[in-house]
């Protein structure tokens, strides 16, 4: 659950209680709103004593003196004005949100002397607040004393010259926050509460936003020949599902764009079982499906002028007596056969049938799949970049640019025939692993065999979707990575 900020925008604010948050660049002599919030002029003295200079994300937190119109004043540094980016405004909003405690009212003054703050910057600041406010504590019956406990509802007035423009831009920010926080919720849910059926039901809830949602059952997938996906699912008593989400915001004649997510709701590794230490984190092995669901939420909420498909393959990988074995050969929906070398390389088996189904049914402009697919990508890139693999240079370049814009960064990895041959099998058309070397690359090549000539990109988000370092806009174990990135891609290039 999240702390609720009721955010509004105004050209001015009449202060009579609560908290005032003032912004200051490194160059400015005074903070925005200082005359209004601090008629006694104590900020300058406090800043001198604390050696506060307006360094980026540094904060000066003081109790307001008697006679001031507020109880607390926080001055937040922005750093050098010339170096401010959209992501810096996002971070500033998150940093500001972290200071809103024990109050039900706050005013934020954005217009720093000598700095032009446009409507987009104000909306980005507000988005940062909403992303930072997220927490997942619905299963806690008691809160620790040191945990942040903002009021259930805080009225926040953001003071900026272009208040009307900021209000208009903020509607998209609310949509983005809703999608990111939905993805975070899904990743954070315990696996006993979120199986394939329950996840599919969460996707079905998007119908209230105008998304068309179909849920394919095991029987329907078997009829379609999805032997790869069903092979993963057969070791669990929880039945698999394939959720197909359609947002029809574009022209009827326009081909859709498509996003496919790996949704392994819990991954034991199957018969090739994982070590016990850290296995609890495998509840997050559906981070790709969570991101796709969150993206569809955003597109529908902001009424994006595009036709978009979201498909998520939902299974649980368990090691019971009916589980698939190393050495099994399964037949995918494409008709290609796969030798299962390692049952812990299951995500690609789920995705290959979902990719083929998407391409065969919808004939999309492109397909982008997201998956917490390999530990190898974490070794290569850590949790700073997600791995990007693509058969299309234009799509890759657009994704990379969207990643830089949103700070959900991607790093393009190589593909090539020398890697592809590593997944050739003696007994089937291919095998599901290529050995220890180049593990993330051979996994991508496996997927590439199921996309034909359609422009395609694979995002390996194993290092960024869960357990990534906390920062100004994310304090959650499940980060919601990919939602903002893909929304920016759609917004920049694919809306009518």
Swiss-Prot record:
Enzyme active site: 274, 348
What is the disulfide pattern of this chain?
Answer: none
Q: Which residues cross the membrane?
A: none
Q: What class of enzyme is it?
A: hydrolase
Locate the residues binding Mn(2+) 2.
262, 267, 285, 346
| Assigned keywords, A-Z | Aminopeptidase, Cytoplasm, Hydrolase, Manganese, Metal-binding, Protease
Q: Name one GO molecular function term.
A: metalloaminopeptidase activity
Give the Enzyme Commission number.
3.4.11.1, 3.4.11.10
Q: Which InterPro entries does the record associate with it?
A: Leucine_aapep/pepB, Macro_dom-like, Peptidase_M17_C, Peptidase_M17_leu_NH2_pept, Peptidase_M17_N
Binding note for cofactor: Binds 2 manganese ions per subunit.
List ligand-binding residues for Mn(2+) 1.
Answer: 267, 344, 346
The processes (GO biological process) annotated in the record are: proteolysis
Q: Which PROSITE patterns match?
A: CYTOSOL_AP
Catalytically driven reaction(s): Release of an N-terminal amino acid, Xaa-|-Yaa-, in which Xaa is preferably Leu, but may be other amino acids including Pro although not Arg or Lys, and Yaa may be Pro. Amino acid amides and methyl esters are also readily hydrolyzed, but rates on arylamides are exceedingly low; Release of an N-terminal amino acid, preferentially leucine, but not glutamic or aspartic acids
Any Gene Ontology CC annotation: cytoplasm
Localization, per the record, is: Cytoplasm
Q: Which cofactor does it need?
A: Mn(2+)
Name the major location.
Answer: cytoplasm
Q: Quote the Gene3D superfamilies the UniProt record gives.
A: Leucine Aminopeptidase, subunit E, domain 1, Zn peptidases
The record ties this protein, via Pfam families, to: Peptidase_M17, Peptidase_M17_N
Q: Which HAMAP family match?
A: Cytosol_peptidase_M17
User: What does it do?
Assistant: Presumably involved in the processing and regular turnover of intracellular proteins. Catalyzes the removal of unsubstituted N-terminal amino acids from various peptides.
Q: Which NCBIfam families match?
A: PRK00913.1-2 (NF002073), PRK00913.1-4 (NF002074), PRK00913.2-2 (NF002075), PRK00913.2-4 (NF002077), PRK00913.3-5 (NF002083)
Give the UniProt family note: Belongs to the peptidase M17 family.
What is the name attached to this protein's record?
Probable cytosol aminopeptidase
Protein species of origin: Rhizobium etli (strain CIAT 652)
